[in-house]
Swiss-Prot record:
Protein name: Serine acetyltransferase
Domain of life according to the entry: Bacteria
GO biological process terms on file: cysteine biosynthetic process from serine
SUPFAM superfamilies attached to this UniProt entry: Trimeric LpxA-like enzymes
Database matches in InterPro entries: Hexapep, Hexapep_transf_CS, LbH_SAT, Ser_AcTrfase_N_sf, Ser_O-AcTrfase, Serine_acetyltransferase, Trimer_LpxA-like_sf
MF term (GO), any: structural constituent of carboxysome shell
Taxonomic classification: Bacteria, Bacillati, Cyanobacteriota, Cyanophyceae, Synechococcales
Amino acid sequence: MLNSLIADFRIIFERDPAARNWLEVLFCYPGLQALLIHRFSHRLYTLGLPFFPRLMSHLARFFTGIEIHPGAQIGQGVFIDHGMGVVIGETAIVGDYSLIYQGVTLGGTGKESGKRHPTLGENVVVGAGAKVLGNIAIGDNVRIGAGSVVLRDVPADFTVVGVPGRMVHPSGERVNPLEHGKLPDSEGKVIRLLLERIELLEQQVATLQQQQSEQAWESDYRSCSETDREPVLCRLGDREIEEFLGGTL
């Protein structure tokens, strides 16, 4: 347990540029405080001691805003950044050196007993507000975008974004866990593709409109010449056609 506590302490300096000194980290980082209490409550929980592990968890939630069930298994070097609103269920497993942001839920999907919470591999990043629900497996080095909802297994090295979570194939480029701007934007990509398709369809429609307008002009011109209609009637027909097509002669 001591090694885990030391790793929890050191990882903050590696991942948070705002960490100035050990005194500030020890007293002003609720994520570290919640993990410190959890590691003691988890030890008591595994020994079968009733009541006190849950009481410690409750007090930790009161003081830090982070709720970790004493039964949850959390590896070393885990960093809960900001932390407010984080919920980690009883049977959840969090791998070494994972990064969890505020508002994250590692929860269940019902009232089933047994293993009912997710298992996170090593070096997993769970963005702010993300929900990982059910007895699912999240592979090593997975990145879960902010606000995503994950309900199925995710292989190692994949990125998950959106609601419901969609897996993005790994590009082979390894990025720093804190570089949120490099997360793929699948919704934005789809919107750009749809806009490009709309632009192409508009160009095709404009071409067809121009062709129809030219054909209608020639047809009206021949009709007027053959029947000796008054020019005003021909102009009226042209005006109606152009108003229908949305253009002007």
